[in-house]
Design a protein with these regions (language model features):
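Short, well-ordered beta-strand elements
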Residues: 2-11, 31-34, 95-99
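Beta->alpha turn/N-cap motifs
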Residues: 13-14, 37-38, 49-61, 72, ...
Length: 246
């Protein structure tokens, strides 16, 4: 293969099963694994700095010759808990939405929900790190990833985007899929997929192994067990196609 395969994985807890599976697998020596926020995963794959990435779905069309290479994903069939719009006011009162810079898929999703499902027209503002403190009054904020755990009891109105998508379309949602920007051997892809699946099959073990010892693992184990749906099944493939068409 001419050196290790460069893999960019998302650094969030929902990806711990994938990371743990890859690190514990027989193909680990063949990988150069980096952990990044979703937007950086996408950038690396698009610009050729990584061969494979766990890419936000909204970025898939930007990858020249990109191929989804496994039947594993980061998805949800109902509430996901970690991709939410937070507000002190009901949706109809929201005037500005701060968009989390870490994933364009979630930003695109909240804009679609606002236009077609909620029927509101707020001002959209791309936020910078630390923007969570600016969520007040008629300014709402889209927060994704592990930072959302700390906000789930702090705001009067919380709109879980995967749940809202399900209410609107009747479909699950796919936040990220494994994409390669170049051909890879069948034997490598088979080993890669098997490693991901092993991690998902042992996801509570993965969370325990990767969390800091001082953190109670139980809530996070429940999260990966109940809120994240890892199979890229037919319903999720349909959801991906619909999302990319809208």
């Amino acid at each position: 293969m001419g050196g290790p395969v460069k893999v960019s994985a998302v650094s969030y807890i929902n990806s711990y099963p994938f990371i743990h599976g890859l690190q514990q697998s027989g193909i680990a020596p063949a990988l150069d694994l980096s952990l990044d926020v979703p937007a950086e995963c996408a950038r690396k794959v698009v610009q050729g700095e990584a061969d494979i990435g766990l890419m936000p779905v909204a970025e898939l069309p930007k990858v020249d010759g990109g191929q989804v290479i496994t039947d594993m994903c980061i998805g949800a069939d109902g509430r996901v808990e970690t991709v939410c719009l937070y507000s002190e006011e009901p949706l109809k009162e929201v005037r500005t939405v701060l968009l989390d810079p870490e994933s364009r898929t979630s930003a695109r999703l909240v804009q679609l929900l606002a236009r077609y499902h909620w029927r509101i027209k707020p001002q959209w503002t791309e936020a910078e790190a630390g923007f969570e403190g600016r969520i007040h009054g008629t300014t709402a904020g889209l927060v994704i990833g592990d930072r959302a755990f700390a906000l789930n009891n702090q705001h009067s109105h919380i709109y879980d985007l995967a749940h809202e998508w399900k209410v609107w379309t009747g479909l699950p949602f796919v936040f990220a899929a494994w994409v390669a920007n170049r051909p890879l051997s069948e034997s490598f892809l088979s080993g890669f997929s098997a490693a991901l699946r092993w991690g998902v099959d042992n996801r509570t073990q993965a969370v325990q192994a990767m969390l800091s010892p001082e953190i109670d693992p139980t809530p996070k184990m429940n999260y990966v067990q109940r809120s994240i749906s890892y199979e890229l099944d037919l319903a999720k493939q349909e959801a991906m196609r619909l999302f990319l068409r809208l």
